[in-house]
């Protein structure tokens, strides 16, 4: 008999083996096997015509035209998990043959298809597999297998591998584990099915890894790519979720991964690592708190037959890391060595920014943890009194990297080093690294004597090189500052900034040596705050190899990461690339940005609007003008001063009044953070009231988005909890924004009852969640190697209070639900507002809009920006069950306008975390490019034709999504700006193009496409980004000015014309706004940077607050350098507020003089470059202040005989990077 099979790829090998054995046994069968990895094609149909039977085992999503197949062969049997697809009386039994599986059942199925009566062999659906033997009961296994090791590890793997004879990965893992541990390898069918006597994965965990309701393993390796599901508790019949099951085990759950689509060679050379696998092999399991997705297997494919094969070196890595975790668990607390890594924003000044952590007081957080460790019995001594004392101790000892004001000689003299690593010791380790890694490091940095520039952090002792590893020791607790990663020496310029001209720049010798030292001396490493550089070092996106720098540096040491619960994009990168277990922390309390100094002015304005009496209105005009003069609203003050000189204050009052009202309304409609969060501390008193009030206001906004009280949060709940819709938040039915909300919150917290019972219940619920937050307790559980419960992440200011309680190992969302329906609708509004504003200002449609598409759009806003991109193109998503399953082109007559072209600079995190979203947008672009429409109504097609005429291929002409090179993160421009390594806009354009001209899409990944990028940028009419929350703004990170600013500058330079820059605002999705970039810079300056309320909040945090202020001012300078959109009054007011103001200057000098130096230096540079035009008096005063600061810093060297060479405050414009750029193939 001749049979053609169309099978799931994973069944093809076992089926072939069965058929070949039958032939050897004399059975007359001929066969052809096709894998469902490929759709049914003409070759299959031709074969079907010549065979006796066509057998199809399909999935519910396979696109199979059964009627078409029957035209070639009517004898077709279809089998599927869904009985609705069965078409034959034989389908049911064939399904059982396949489901029970194994060689015997596949042989019997073939014989059954040939007309022989064969029974299904009923193999168990769960059990313990060990050394070729299956045990269905735990007791039987424990009696038969001797446990002679100290620790026990469980493995949970899919029965599918066992019955399909695809066990290479499992066997290799088991063999390696056997050398170190007792092992309990459990196989499970996954889903519970009583008809098959299949318990399901969750119940299998309870059956085989617990005895007498107590765990018998120290760690679990979960190789499943689907949730454990829920089981019924036998005691009370309640359902127990997968997370509750793992909490019963209370051990770390490791999740090594396999590539289901790539061979070993493909994976090894692929810069992406994994791609299509990410959603279901990594993202979904993270919902149950699994950790460390290290790849251990790939799929080899030969003639359509697939087998999984283990990667022994990666398996070895997994086992070594598990061993370190278990050893940590059993080590006495008094002997455990803990190392805290504080981050450092080197480009924004090493000395000014120690302890960088978004919205977290990292120093006080570490002190709180150290004190708790001591209480718990850890050996911790000489704990500083508070966080400020810790910060000052680090700076007094200079336990940091070299920079403009810090030399190695100073570090050594002041005792800021932990260890001096001998050259021999370092090279013994260095020589164990892969050959191409060593070569790249040596090519970039040379040996320990340096290359082009002296090697960083090297101290010579008796003529021998010693690598200086900095930090402070407090008994068995170490506090270290993360080393610099892309530059070296006591300078910051275009010569030492190697990363400026090399996105693949490896970390320095000292960086690698430091992490090697951390691995050797400590039992666990804890990175403090969002975020550092480790997880962003070059390497694969996910599924890293031993040639990827995060994998090299983290080594085998257990890794906990204190991370802001509002930042899932970057936190998820840390989980997947540096094997971090996240302990998330609460977000900052957000308060109304309106401040006391404006209240009298506001009351006059309110009175003026109501007053009808002309004389009183005239009097109020005087009062308003005088009151403005008392504020820091410099822009209005300057206008008033000019008009007063002309004697026309009353004639021009309406113009002043309208602008003043707009400014005050803008401040009223904004919030600012009240200082920073301190890890382990809960907001109390007034802060607790403000915190809950801001959450309730956000719930009101989200539940009423697009006139739907429930849609937004319901959709987010399903995206955040796929398969668990009831785990999300119930909607809150507000009918209006309550003006008395603050009092009501306060009353409930003080035990009073209020009339609105639903609101009262909600306040109590949020308050209870806050109280349950036990951040330090969770961290201590992590150090004890226990299970850290997972939880959702995102913005509280978007109503997502399900992120409470904090102290959890957060997860992201289901990427295939993006954009949600409500997010797409917001995107439509945003697109319409932007187009209409441009139409009003320019009188024509924009042909090409260049956008900065950040991962926060997906993680915080469910893809509003992505929805906007699709709608600009005239495309909409097609949904099935809440998931995006395709795209539909909107007809031109329905769209009512031309299709707008888009040029997208996507963030590296979006590229790596959401490849499906990248591919979907690229598919939309391709669809539009291929439409048969007039060029004047389809700007995508118009620009494709233009590029074809310039000699580009069709695919190159459709490249619209660009990013940095694969495995790298950054934009290039920020390095040039911070290092002062630029002379004109052309230089910044060159840096941007060099770093960002790599195309991404459905069939292209990181293809260098400079011509395509430059050509499409020449057609750009405007650039765009958006704000979704007041927690983060365009001064909040250097990526904003580096990418959006860099994009704007590049478009302007290449086009040779003005390119407008706009900013969208979806903080309130019911009231979407579009502003110019200049207006957004003004808004953020007034509501935060120059806001006395915000400044006082920062000042409460001493050194850390001063550093954060300086960083934001550096980004103001960055925006001015890249776009020239910062008005003079903003620089003037920065000078007045932070340098000229005696009280604030004193604060900086006492707490962080380096932050003050950085502020003053950037102001001087802005003036020297013509970015800031101000009075000679201001400049003279600034120069005097700077000389005083310089003198104060230099006094700190007085006790050091030989300080060595350092740059200090000079601005040295070194353009050697451009020569390197050209030699690197610009």
Curated annotation (Swiss-Prot):
Pfam families: CobN-Mg_chel. It comes from the Archaea. InterPro entries: CobN/Mg_chltase. GO terms for biological process: biosynthetic process. Disulfide bonds: none annotated. NCBIfam families: PRK05989.2-1. Belongs to the Mg-chelatase subunit H family. This is Uncharacterized protein MJ1441. It comes from Methanocaldococcus jannaschii (strain ATCC 43067 / DSM 2661 / JAL-1 / JCM 10045 / NBRC 100440).
